[in-house]
Amino acid sequence: MKDLPAFPCSWVWLLWSFCSVQVCSTQPRAQEHPGFAVLASASHYWPLENVDGILELQDTTGALRTLNLTVPLSHNATFVFTNDSAYSNLSATVDIMEGKVNKGIYLKEEKGVTFLYYGTYKSSCISNPAQCGPEGVTFSFFWKTQGDQTRPAPYAYGGQVVSDGFKVCSSGGKGSVELYTRDNSMTWKATFNPPGPYWTHVLFTWKSKEGLKVYVNGTLSTSDPSGKVSHTYGDPHVNLVIGSEQDQTKRYENGAFDEFIIWERALTPDEIKMYFTAAIGKHALLSSTPPAMPTAHTVIPTDAYHPIITNLTEERKRFQRPGTVLRYLQNVSLRLPNKSLSEETALNLTETFLRTVGEVLLLPSWTHESEDNAMTLGLVDTIDTVMGHISSNLQSREPHVTLTGSSSTAEFTVAKVLPPALSAPHYRFPAHGHSYIEIPREALHSQAWTTIVGLLYHTMHYYLKNIHPTSTEIPEAVNCRDCLLSVASHLISLEVSPPPTLSQNLSGSPLITVHLRHKLTQKQYSDATNESNRLFLYCAFLNFSSGEGVWSSQGCALTEGNLTYSVCHCTHLTNFAILMQVVPLKLTHGHQVALSSISYVGCSLSVLCLAATLVTFAVLSSVSTIRNQRYHIHANLSFAVLVAQVLLLISFSMEPGTVPCQVLAVLLHYFFLTAFAWMLVEGLHLYSMVIKVFGSEDSKHLYYYGIGWGCPLLICIISISSSMDSYGTSDSCWLALGSGAIWAFVGPALLVIVVNIVILVAVTRVISHISTDSYKIHGDPSAFKLTAKAVAVLLPILGTSWVFGVLAVSDRALVFQYMFAILNSLQGLFIFLFHCLLNSEVRAAFKHKTKVWSLTSSSARTANTKPFSSDTVNGTRPGTASTKLSPWDKSSHSAHRVDLSAV
């Protein structure tokens, strides 16, 4: 090949575009070395000139095997158009200074640039390494320099890297590789010994998580794993160029390149070594190689694992159905060759397999098809098989070798150690973090090689849910057969061979310590913190002894923890996780029967009493004292509570989940809301009569009916339209407790309770003040008894007994559950007693009505019957004042002149 002109600093530029050379995939028969299979998998390949000692990829006839490569013919013209496919896609007229160079085009533009152009690569992995994905990218070429020059080279660009790409430079006794990604303005740089006058193979790989690695003659030379931020780096061009730049302050070097190759993935160390040995010949040395240069006297044997790694990389691009993918991975795990693994191959196989598993978990159909957990458990078992094979076949000459890494699937460790090499008091995996497993040092007694495999899965727990207790070997969980379990922590695995010597008794030692930080979903956290539920946490492991993964707690005990973490002690090793079971609080059968009996009897009695109350109010409606607004409110409240309790009694015999049950749930919701709404009206009316006077009763009549019947209807319409499926679908014909629809009842009910309690306190203070004044003026001790009586009378109509329902939310508040059942179910009885049977106005009206009936039966007095008035009931003639003062009237001279008839 022809050498390039004198270069001040030999550069490899990626400025990028579209007319690359693609490599044929069929391996020629004449080239059986596995390194040529690595070369055949390249994305772009420019063989350039034939160089003695550097082998190219040939077909069966010995011809160069490339695609879309046109070797430029001899040109006599001084100028050619470079949009000719023989040159490049540049649409400019250039001067061919040297003609054909390395089967590229050596150009000199007006700006004085001396370059080899290979085309442009817009929007590709080559133009932007950040677009290569997690697989990364690899650049490879052979390079040599021809010594110093005394004359300067033609003028060229000075120190610029264009677009996202890389730069390779040799100057002043140093070689360097720089790689830049414009997307995040990151730069990686590594230095190495520059090539001399002998052909040197330079290859570098880049992966976003591993950074830059530079290999010289097949061996890792230097690296930059982290990189740094650089915002002022490069120009936005897209050409792929090998060329030179001039710096008058530096020495000038001639340089030459051969076999320029790009893989759109990062090669493994084994692949790099195989390609290098293939390129230089099975037993050949590099031509003109000095004695001090590393040589390859023997050929690396065919790596039995390389085809598996390659197939995994290729097959995962075609993954679609989880079931098919799982069977493929299981076949891979069962057909792994029983051959030794170097550290590099073991690490590569581990990373590739776990990366493949990560691709499986990202399939849109995986979540749906893995709902029964069998698919996920099969995947975990397959991973265990592969990792066990890798650890058992890992070869090492050192007493302690550990391979560690992390992927989207799991954090892993594969170790092969001699126990005497372990000096720490315990072995811990992983070494850092809140979730880990510890093995005491005294449990590792074996003097032979010990293999250790650790896996901390990142997302596997999300796919292990809805576990039926009957399908587990956790006796405590079976106590609630309908309460499903779910994984509440990371899944962590640790396998040691030969197994550690552990106590078979949980009270003995040594034992395995498993410390797991909980990873709760929003639903899990909500269920766990709900006071109506009881939370159970189990230390569990996956038992594959039966061929299928079964969760078991045998040999494990939870020794410490809370809602954030759990600590377990176990007598064995395997896959561990914390299982969570949420059990709704349930009373004993005896308490359930007692509370049900109270509810049945109380509601039945209330229905009868409320019916009697409504009949009484209807019969006495012609009496003026019963026609006032207060008794209208009592009647509406009684009717709402009556209908609600009748519907409640009917719901006890309905089948949940049916359409009639759903309709009944809607009616229950509405009528219980109306009951609370009329309790609120009772409170507001009491406030207006005792504390303030807002106006006449007639002016508030429509407002009260709007609150009592209109507001509940509006709330129900909104609730039904937004969550109709929450009605009658749980264990009873009521709103589903697990959904937000329950707040369409609880919210208004709590509001009414709070408002009425405030009103009750205010009214009680007024009554107490009047009672105190009455006692001071008249010395009547019965005034204090009237305060207690007034409170007792107001409680049923204000609904404050529902406070006990709020307090009765757990099994530790059993007394409140009984109090709520008694007071709430007997609300109708209390209304009938306090506001009908024992009410003086109602009794007086009833006596008057009785007299009217008796007079009506006598024809002699029918025509003389006069309208009844409150004055007549009180024993006073119309127009005269009563001479008998009640305790309330005795205080009329005080400042508290209020209307207490509402009480």
From Swiss-Prot:
Keyword list (alphabetical) reads:
Cell membrane, Disulfide bond, Glycoprotein, Membrane, Receptor, Signal, Transmembrane, Transmembrane helix
Gene3D superfamilies membership: 2.60.120.200, 2.60.220.50, Rhodopsin 7-helix transmembrane proteins
Q: Which Cys pairs does UniProt list as disulfide-bonded?
A: 539-568, 556-570, 661-733
Which Pfam families does the UniProt entry name for this protein? 7tm_2, GPS, Laminin_G_3
- Answer whether the UniProt record assigns the keyword Acetylation to this protein: no
Q: Which residues form the GAIN-B domain?
A: 401-586
Here the segments flagged for biased composition (Basic and acidic residues) are 890-903
Site entry (Cleavage), positions: 573-574
- Which positions does UniProt annotate with glycan attachment? 68, 76, 83, 89, 217, 311, 331, 338, 348, 505, 530, 543, 562
Q: Where is the composition biased (Polar residues)?
A: 862-885
Query: Where is the region GPS?
Result: 539-586
| Family matches, as SUPFAM superfamilies | Concanavalin A-like lectins/glucanases
GO BP, sorted A to Z: adenylate cyclase-activating G protein-coupled receptor signaling pathway; cell surface receptor signaling pathway; G protein-coupled receptor signaling pathway; neurogenesis; regulation of skeletal muscle contraction
Membrane-spanning ranges? 600-620, 633-653, 663-683, 702-722, 741-761, 790-810, 814-834
Q: Anything known on activity regulation? A: Forms a heterodimer of 2 chains generated by proteolytic processing that remain associated through non-covalent interactions mediated by the GAIN-B domain. In the inactivated receptor, the Stachel sequence (also named stalk) is embedded in the GAIN-B domain, where it adopts a beta-strand conformation. On activation, the Stachel moves into the 7 transmembrane region and adopts a twisted hook-shaped configuration that forms contacts within the receptor, leading to coupling of a G-alpha protein, which activates signaling.
Which segments carry the region annotation Stachel? 575-583
Ranges for domain Pentraxin (PTX) come to: 111-305
GO MF annotation list: G protein-coupled receptor activity
Q: Binding residues for 17beta-hydroxy-5alpha-androstan-3-one, per the UniProt record?
A: 592
Deletion phenotype: Decreased, but not abolished, stimulatory effect of 5alpha-dihydrotestosterone (5alpha-DHT) on local cAMP production and on muscle strength.
Subcellular location field: Cell membrane
Note on domains (UniProt): The Stachel sequence (also named stalk) in the C-terminal part of the extracellular domain (ECD) functions as a tethered agonist. In the inactivated receptor, the Stachel sequence (also named stalk) is embedded in the GAIN-B domain, where it adopts a beta-strand conformation. On activation, the Stachel moves into the 7 transmembrane region and adopts a twisted hook-shaped configuration that forms contacts within the receptor, leading to coupling of a G-alpha protein, which activates signaling. The N-terminal domain and autocatalytic activity of ADGRD1 at the GPCR proteolysis site (GPS) are not required for G-protein coupling activity.
Describe the task this protein carries out. Adhesion G-protein coupled receptor (aGPCR) for androgen hormone 5alpha-dihydrotestosterone (5alpha-DHT), also named 17beta-hydroxy-5alpha-androstan-3-one, the most potent hormone among androgens. Also activated by methenolone drug. Ligand binding causes a conformation change that triggers signaling via guanine nucleotide-binding proteins (G proteins) and modulates the activity of downstream effectors, such as adenylate cyclase. ADGRD1 is coupled to G(s) G proteins and mediates activation of adenylate cyclase activity.
Query: What's the family?
Result: Belongs to the G-protein coupled receptor 2 family. Adhesion G-protein coupled receptor (ADGR) subfamily.
This protein's assembly is summarised as: Heterodimer of 2 chains generated by proteolytic processing; the large extracellular N-terminal fragment and the membrane-bound C-terminal fragment predominantly remain associated and non-covalently linked. Interacts with ESYT1; interaction takes place in absence of cytosolic calcium and inhibits the G protein-coupled receptor activity of ADGRD1.
Output this protein's name: Adhesion G-protein coupled receptor D1
Its organism's taxonomic lineage begins at: Eukaryota, Metazoa, Chordata, Craniata, Vertebrata
